[in-house]
Every structure is written in C-alpha cells, then in structure tokens.
A protein has these predicted regions:
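N-terminal glycine-rich phosphate-binding loop and ensuing alpha1 helix
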Residues: 2-61
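Residue-level signal for inorganic ion chemistry
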Residues: 9, 35, 92, 105-106, ...
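Hydrophobic packing residues within well-ordered alpha-helices of enzyme cores
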Residues: 18, 42, 63-64, 120, ...
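Conserved N-terminal catalytic core of the sugar/cofactor nucleotidyltransferase
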Residues: 36-99
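Residues at the starts of beta-strands that form the adenosine-phosphate
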Residues: 49-51, 129, 195
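Conserved beta-loop-beta/alpha segment of the NTase-like Rossmann-fold superfamily
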Residues: 76, 83-146, 160
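A recurrent flexible, glycine/aromatic-enriched loop bordering the glycosyltransferase active site
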Residues: 149-159
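Conserved alpha/beta core of the MobA/IspD/sugar-nucleotide pyrophosphorylase nucleotidyltransferase superfamily
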Residues: 157-221
Length: 221
C-alpha cells in the first residue's frame, strides 16, 4: 500500500535581500505570488498531496486573504515558522503522521515540475530519504586567510529541494537538538544515522533569493 503524501512548503523567510515590503515568497510574478507558483506544482501531480505551508504569523492573514480572493487552495495547514528553518520544519511535522511520505520544499523554488516531483516521491517510497543535487559548473575558490585558493569543483554538489522522506525517519531525525550545520533536511537525517540517496536534480530548479533571481523568475514564469 502506497504511503499518503505530504508537502511541507517552507515560506517563513523574511526576504531582507529583496528590498521589498513583502517577503520574496509573496511577491507577484506573472500575476501570482511566487509561493502560489510553487504550490501549484504539487497540486498538479497525479497523486494527491496534502499541503502544509510554514510561515510567519505576521503574514498568515495576508495569505489567507489572498487565497480567499483568488479562490485558491481551499484546504491547507498553516503552521507557524520557527526561529530557524530547522524549527520551522519541526513545527510542520506535528501535522504529518507516521507511515507517510513527506517532501520538504523551499517556497521560493517555483521551477520544479510535477513529473520531477513524482519521481522523487517514488524514489523516497523505496529508499526512505532522497534529495536532488546537481554538479557545480562554475569554478570555485575557498577562502583562506586573507585570500582565496582554488578548489576542485568535482568534489562538490549543489543540493536542492524538495527532499522527500518516510515521515517516521524525518520525525526521528528532528528529535535531535539543533545544530548550526543543519542547513537542510538531508543533513539532519544523515546526522541521525539514516542512509540517504542523491538523485539528479534540475539545473533550473533555482532558489529565488536576490533581485537578480527575481528577474529570472519573471522571464521564465
């Protein structure tokens, strides 16, 4: 029997680098908030997914009002974001039962496709913990003292979201105390001793972080 699917969309960031009144996840691109573009990719999957959006209390009324006005997303869960991404995801897991599959995705990664999401869920069903990653293509340098030294980019990968897990694995992993090294869910799971798997990501599955990224989103969405 296949596990029920959940998507935890992390949208609690303040977006200070955007120089905008609204956090970046709420900025309109092609007539819709960036967050809506992201959520729609999950809603377009063939297999239904329960939507959980983690956001700051400050913007919950804004989002609820937008959904009502736009007749969008009648059913969703809206936990409160925490002090860090780790704590935000931990809050969301209170709404996910054991025996499910849970994808954790950045609310400002709108370029995933339903087909790509489906593949990640299917892989996680088999292995328990999976994330997409892409090789680095730019030359990289490591900061060293007052200067920099070249680094071998073939030794590194850029890890993306969504990262998909058996819910009981992710819940147990999030029972650990917070560590500053926990920059994504895969790191939390690996630190807890669970095996992980990386699969080929999408080069264009970028995280919208800067005004320049926003210009890219405007061109592609």
């Amino acid at each position: 029997m296949e596990r029920k699917r959940y998507a935890v969309i992390v949208a609690a960031g303040s977006g200070t680098r955007m120089n905008s009144k609204l956090p970046k996840q709420f900025i309109e691109i092609a007539g819709k908030p960036l967050l809506r573009h992201t959520v729609e990719k999950f809603l377009a999957m063939d297999v239904p997914v329960e939507i959980i959006i983690v956001m700051s209390d400050e913007y919950k009324d804004w989002w609820k009002s937008y959904c009502r006005r736009s007749d969008f997303l009648e059913k969703y869960i809206l936990p409160t974001g925490g002090f860090t991404r780790f704590h935000s995801v931990k809050n969301a897991l209170e709404y996910v039962p054991d025996g499910a599959l849970v994808a954790v995705h950045d609310g400002v990664r709108p370029f995933v496709t339903p087909e790509f999401l489906e593949g990640l869920f299917e892989e996680a069903e088999k292995c328990g913990a999976v994330a997409p990653a892409v090789p680095l293509v730019e030359s990289i340098r490591e900061m060293s003292g007052d200067g920099t030294v070249p680094a071998d980019r073939s030794r590194f990968l850029s890890v993306q979201t969504p990262q998909v897990f058996h819910s009981e694995i992710l819940r147990k992993a999030y029972g650990q105390s917070y560590d500053t090294s926990f920059t994504d869910d895969l790191t939390v799971v690996q630190k807890a001793g669970f095996p992980i798997k990386l699969v080929a990501g999408l080069r264009y599955n970028v995280k919208i972080t800067t005004p320049e990224d926003l210009e890219l989103a405007e061109a592609l969405l």
